[in-house]
């Protein structure tokens, strides 16, 4: 029997070649026994039917290969036998690769069908959503009663929304859709992520593409909307409004403010720029620029003495260092210290360091802080006057006593 040509042998499937390949074509009998799965099999895609027809056709070709192998084993020509066995070995390797590829395609289609059946069943009766991820072979579960707890109607809070969304999907082990190398995810996972992020969008927040079912388009729409309203000049003014000195009395509010400014900058840049060293240096310079000179040196000293924890971002480490320094240097609660700046109402610095302070000497009663010390000085001056008056009266009384004693001595003489 003539040896099949190369193009034919590439499509040959031999279900007797190896037990490993035979095991892959077995189907899940348990799933096929269910009524729902039977309905799915009855309307199986035409591509699967074509795969099955190819399997039957390949068996016929395989019989010819077996007959060829038997004839080779009966010949006395050792050299010819070796050459043809070598060619058959190469053909078998190609056939095995083709078999593995074909079987994987069949299994993938059947797995998708079984997953759809399972998803429909869980959606109807279960308490969670089932989905697949690119980063794990195990299925993930997202509780139906879980709600994304951040909601905003303000475009200025889009960076906070995206940052909280990133933390939220990491908690429930979704694929990180903010990574550069992830450009497509499982449709089921995409559907759930769209549901989650839309829970955080208020009705009055007019953002393009929020009605789409593509999570990547929603994220890009949010970022583009934010960029259009927050150019470089707007961001620079936002940094310049913040000034922190050693009198800061609300460290929690300060942390939220600095975090918001950092997120404002990070979400302006593309994915590839967010881990760029230049961005790290830029953010460090911006954060240090918010510190008054009375606080800046202490923060620099602390940064020098404390090594950076590689487990957190550089800007997060820098903000934590600023907050720790502020807490250590913040004044003890006292009625004599003003609660907020009289010029800009900020709780991060005192009036004397404010950028809006006019270039003139403050009147004694212009602020509570100055007025207190003015009153204390007036009281001290009054005390000194009273003391001087008592001393003068005492001197006059002493003089009168001396004169009286002198008169008595003169009379005796």
Swiss-Prot record:
Cysteines engaged in disulfide bonds, as pairs: none
Coiled-coil intervals: 39-115
Keyword Coiled coil among record annotations: yes
Residues covered by region (Disordered): 380-413
Origin superkingdom: Eukaryota
Record field: compositional bias (Low complexity): 403-413
A single GO BP: viral translational frameshifting
Keyword DNA damage in record: no
Keywords assigned by UniProt, alphabetized: Coiled coil, Transposable element
Known role: Capsid protein (CA) is the structural component of the virus-like particle (VLP), forming the shell that encapsulates the retrotransposons dimeric RNA genome.
More info: Retrotransposons are mobile genetic entities that are able to replicate via an RNA intermediate and a reverse transcription step. In contrast to retroviruses, retrotransposons are non-infectious, lack an envelope and remain intracellular. Ty4 retrotransposons belong to the copia elements (pseudoviridae).
Name listed for the protein in its UniProt record: Transposon Ty4-H Gag polyprotein
Organism: Saccharomyces cerevisiae (strain ATCC 204508 / S288c)
């Amino acid at each position: 029997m003539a040896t099949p040509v190369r193009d034919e042998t590439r499509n040959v499937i031999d279900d007797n070649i190896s037990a490993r390949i035979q095991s892959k074509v077995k189907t899940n009998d348990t799933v096929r026994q269910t009524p729902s799965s039977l309905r799915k099999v009855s309307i199986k895609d035409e591509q699967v039917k074509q795969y099955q027809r190819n399997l039957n056709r390949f068996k016929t070709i395989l019989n010819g290969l077996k007959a060829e192998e038997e004839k080779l084993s009966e010949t006395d020509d050792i050299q010819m036998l070796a050459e043809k066995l070598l060619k058959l070995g190469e053909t078998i390797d190609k056939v095995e690769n083709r078999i593995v590829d074909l079987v994987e395609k069949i299994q993938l289609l059947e797995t998708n069908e079984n997953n759809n059946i399972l998803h429909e069943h869980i959606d109807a009766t279960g308490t969670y959503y089932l989905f697949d991820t690119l980063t794990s072979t195990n299925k993930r579960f997202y509780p139906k009663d879980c709600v994304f707890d951040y909601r905003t109607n303000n475009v200025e809070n889009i960076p906070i929304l995206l940052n909280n969304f990133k933390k939220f999907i990491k908690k429930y082990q979704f694929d990180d859709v903010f990574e550069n190398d992830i450009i497509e995810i499982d449709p089921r996972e995409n559907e759930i992520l769209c549901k989650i992020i839309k829970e955080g969008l208020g009705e009055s927040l007019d953002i393009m593409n929020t009605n789409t079912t593509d999570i990547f388009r929603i994220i890009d729409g949010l970022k583009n909307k934010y960029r259009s309203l927050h150019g470089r000049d707007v961001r620079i003014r936002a940094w310049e409004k913040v000034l922190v000195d050693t009198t800061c009395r609300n460290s929690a509010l300060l942390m939220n403010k600095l975090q918001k400014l950092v997120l404002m900058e990070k979400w302006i840049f593309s994915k590839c720029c967010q881990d760029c060293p230049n961005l790290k240096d830029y953010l460090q310079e911006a954060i240090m620029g918010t510190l008054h000179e009375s606080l800046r040196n202490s923060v620099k000293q602390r940064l020098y003495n404390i090594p950076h924890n590689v487990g957190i971002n550089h800007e997060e480490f820098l903000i934590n260092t600023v907050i720790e320094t502020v807490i250590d240097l913040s004044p003890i609660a006292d009625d004599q210290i003003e609660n907020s700046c009289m010029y800009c109402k900020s709780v991060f610095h005192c009036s004397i360091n404010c950028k809006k302070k006019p270039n003139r000497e403050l009147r004694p009663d212009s602020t509570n802080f100055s007025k207190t010390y003015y009153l204390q000085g007036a009281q001290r001056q009054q005390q000194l006057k009273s003391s001087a008056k008592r001393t003068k009266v005492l001197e006059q009384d002493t003089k009168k006593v001396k004169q009286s004693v002198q008169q008595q001595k003169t009379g005796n003489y």
